[in-house]
């Protein structure tokens, strides 16, 4: 029997949650393809969904509009389902510059990227969970609609080993190379293996902290064990194990040879076309680049940019949808689109932007026409393959309402009895000084403030201004990388700083109960940042606090402002009426501050190590065990050398200082 979801929570459904859960389950069981959950900010939509998932017991994919919200959802689901597989799938690029050609300046931009190894491991862990288990909740960004390796080839390439199996060490090593693992005798890191006599150590690409040891005797698997690659200490013994490929883009050798033949045919056709049009430079360019890729594929089984040949590698026909994360989903999967009013338009926009860039590469001989099939899904393709879907939003758009045929499940009453925030409109002429005085009122109460501006420059200038007046403030915008965004929000909740300034990221889903004031600067500047939906979403960030207030600074009241204020006031009236009728006294939310990127990792012994944050190098370690200190020294030294190798010398210096402090601590307890 499949493992069931086990929901862990100290709370029971309350407010509008019980009827919302019941309606969702009834709709899904009766075969409704689309449902919309309209839940106000702070009404516990995530808890409602977790209850529905647990009762239905179906694998679930949750799409979030950005990495920050995906990380927050991942953390919440990890808390609700600690005994099940909660996984995280977002783009693994910290920095990404796709290859492009600008005809006007005749300049070709090479592909350049910085891959986050931790997120790459989480992606591989996510697909592994989908293939192995049914009790999976997978939180993903729109990255889920981009091309991924074909699941059929991925499954074919897996290496299965069983104790007692007859297999030579040479055969195992060859299979590991086929899976794109690298041999490294000096350092066992993720995606590598080492050989010592008849003992093969493998650090699986999808594993974070545990490696495998395969012990052979006379071409027979004698023992399979799990060990800590940092200390070498054994953890467990296994009867069988499956080693998954290092990347999603692995292909069996025979498929690569078939693909190479097909690529050669297309190359000859393309060369002929260019010569007929007297495009000699383009003909020479496509020949040189493609023949180099073919040679790499013949020799190594892969090449840089192998995804551009995905049509041939996956055996799909021209124009057919590429394999994506959706191909890895089980047939009975459930799809939840969070903040659907933002996420759905994103899904529709991805294809066109990608297409226009690739057409230039194809037209000027940098890529074969088949590269156009390495793309995100078109919106129609997404609609076709999407399983049963629940749209979730406080402000659903017409698309979701039409898809649900007007059947909206409403969740307006909060379990805590909290009301929507009080709204005030104040003059724009004195907005910065007025904001400063409002911040100073909240600092003694240990309450936090969110401020939303219209531009990055304005956010940065306002941060500097507040610093000059002794206010601890930070800004959050698109230039801040994924992990750092999560850390900034965590630091705000912990009180390391008091004011967070943003543009478009301080909206959907941000769950910060400590925030009692949301200030919207230049609220009368009509546009997508100050539309009715944007204003409702932004003001909603103060709805999780007992003293929640939203201040709109404006010279006039626009149509969007008027509508947003009316919706909020109507909800507030409804919530207040419910509280009076049921004798409910509003209670502020008290939510534990977790580092979502650490959730699910096997923690070291409690009390031994105060865990530093993901992006924090000078962590304040209070370690009482010598073994833990030695382990942390080894880890910090490894990170120090990695930073130095990437020419990130400032980070390397921080890790060096950390190692020095740990050595001092080791001496003091010795």
Curated annotation (Swiss-Prot):
> Where is the motif named Beta-hairpin mapped on this chain?
92-115
| Database matches in PROSITE patterns | HELICASE_ATP_BIND_1 (PS51192), HELICASE_CTER (PS51194), UVR (PS50151)
Q: Which residues form the UVR domain?
A: 630-665
Q: Which residues make up the binding site for ATP? A: 39-46
Output one GO BP term: SOS response
Places the protein is found: Cytoplasm
InterPro entries to which the protein is assigned, alphabetical: Helicase/UvrB_N, Helicase_ATP-bd, Helicase_C-like, P-loop_NTPase, UVR_dom, UVR_dom_sf, UvrB, UvrB_inter
UniProt key word ATP-binding: yes
Keywords, alphabetical: ATP-binding, Cytoplasm, DNA damage, DNA excision, DNA repair, Excision nuclease, Helicase, Hydrolase, Nucleotide-binding, SOS response
Q: Which CDD domains match?
A: DEXHc_UvrB, SF2_C_UvrB
* Record-annotated Helicase ATP-binding domain positions: 26-183
Q: Where is the Helicase C-terminal domain?
A: 431-597
Q: What is known of its domains?
A: The beta-hairpin motif is involved in DNA binding.
The entry's function note states:
The UvrABC repair system catalyzes the recognition and processing of DNA lesions. A damage recognition complex composed of 2 UvrA and 2 UvrB subunits scans DNA for abnormalities. Upon binding of the UvrA(2)B(2) complex to a putative damaged site, the DNA wraps around one UvrB monomer. DNA wrap is dependent on ATP binding by UvrB and probably causes local melting of the DNA helix, facilitating insertion of UvrB beta-hairpin between the DNA strands. Then UvrB probes one DNA strand for the presence of a lesion.
Q: How does it assemble?
A: Forms a heterotetramer with UvrA during the search for lesions. Interacts with UvrC in an incision complex.
Name listed for the protein in its UniProt record: UvrABC system protein B
In which organism is this protein found? Answer: Psychromonas ingrahamii (strain DSM 17664 / CCUG 51855 / 37)
């Amino acid at each position: 029997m499949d493992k069931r979801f086990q929901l862990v929570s100290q709370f029971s459904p309350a407010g509008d949650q019980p009827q919302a859960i019941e309606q969702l389950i009834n709709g899904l069981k009766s075969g409704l393809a689309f449902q919309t959950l309209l839940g106000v900010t702070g009404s516990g939509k995530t808890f409602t969904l977790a209850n529905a998932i647990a009762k239905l017991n179906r694998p679930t994919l949750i799409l979030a509009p950005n990495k920050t919200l995906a990380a927050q959802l991942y953390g919440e689901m990890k808390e609700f389902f600690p005994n099940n597989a909660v996984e995280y799938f977002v783009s693994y690029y910290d920095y990404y510059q796709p290859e492009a050609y600008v005809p006007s300046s005749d300049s070709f931009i090479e592909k350049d990227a910085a891959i986050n190894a931790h997120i790459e491991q989480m992606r591989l862990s996510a697909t592994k969970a989908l293939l192995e288990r049914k009790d999976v909740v997978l939180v993903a960004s729109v990255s889920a609609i981009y091309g991924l390796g074909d699941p059929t080839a991925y499954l074919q390439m897996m290496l299965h080993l069983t104790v007692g199996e007859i297999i030579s060490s040479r055969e195992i090593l060859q299979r590991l190379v086929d899976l794109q693992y690298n041999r490294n005798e000096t350092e066992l890191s993720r995606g590598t293996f080492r050989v010592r006599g008849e003992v093969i150590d493998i650090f699986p690409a999808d594993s974070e902290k545990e490696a495998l040891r395969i012990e052979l005797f006379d071409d027979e698997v004698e023992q399979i064990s799990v060990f800590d690659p940092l200390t070498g200490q054994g953890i467990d013994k296994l009867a069988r194990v499956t080693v998954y490929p290092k990347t999603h883009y692995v292909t069996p050798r025979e498929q690569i040879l078939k693909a190479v033949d097909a690529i050669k045919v297309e190359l000859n056709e393309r060369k002929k076309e260019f010569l007929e049009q007297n495009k000699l430079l383009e003909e020479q360019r496509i020949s040189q680049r493609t023949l180099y890729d073919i040679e790499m594929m013949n020799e190594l089984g892969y090449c840089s940019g192998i995804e551009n040949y995905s049509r041939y590698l996956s055996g799909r026909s021209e124009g057919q949808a590429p394999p994506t994360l959706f191909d890895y989903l089980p047939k009975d999967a459930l799809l939840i689109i969070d903040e659907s009013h933002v996420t759905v338009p994103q899904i529709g926009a991805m294809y066109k932007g990608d297409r226009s860039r690739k057409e230039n590469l194809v037209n000027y001989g940098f890529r074969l026409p088949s590269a156009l099939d390495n793309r995100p899904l078109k919106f129609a393709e997404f609609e076709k393959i999407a399983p049963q879907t629940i749209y979730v939003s406080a402000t659903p758009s017409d698309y979701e309402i039409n898809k649900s045929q007007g059947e909206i499940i409403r969740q307006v009453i909060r379990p805590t009895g909290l009301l929507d925030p009080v709204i005030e409109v104040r003059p724009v002429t004195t907005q910065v000084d007025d904001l400063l005085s409002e911040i100073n009122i909240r600092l003694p109460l240990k309450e936090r403030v969110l401020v939303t501006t219209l531009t990055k420059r304005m956010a940065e200038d306002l941060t500097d201004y507040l610093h000059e007046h002794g206010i601890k403030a930070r800004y959050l915008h698109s230039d801040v990388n994924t992990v750092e965004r999560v850390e900034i929000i965590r630091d705000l909740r912990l009180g390391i700083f008091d004011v967070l300034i943003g543009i478009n990221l301080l909206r959907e889903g941000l769950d910060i109960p400590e925030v009692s004031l949301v200030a919207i600067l230049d609220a009368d500047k009509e546009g997508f940042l100050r539309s009715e939906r944007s204003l409702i979403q932004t003001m909603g960030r103060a709805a999780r606090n007992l003293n929640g207030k939203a201040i709109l600074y404006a010279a006039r009241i626009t149509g969007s402002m008027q509508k947003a204020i009316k919706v909020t006031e109507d909800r507030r009236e409804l919530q207040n009426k419910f509280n009076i009728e049921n004798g409910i006294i509003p209670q502020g939310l008290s939510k534990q501050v977790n580092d979502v990127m650490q959730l699910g990792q096997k923690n070291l012994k409690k009390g031994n190590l105060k865990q530093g944050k993901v992006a924090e190098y000078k962590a304040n370690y209070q370690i009482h065990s010598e073994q833990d200190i030695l382990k942390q020294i080894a880890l910090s030294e490894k990170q120090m050398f990695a930073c130095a190798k990437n020419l990130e010398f400032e980070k390397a210096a921080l890790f060096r200082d950390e190692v020095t402090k740990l050595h001092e601590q080791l001496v003091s307890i010795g």
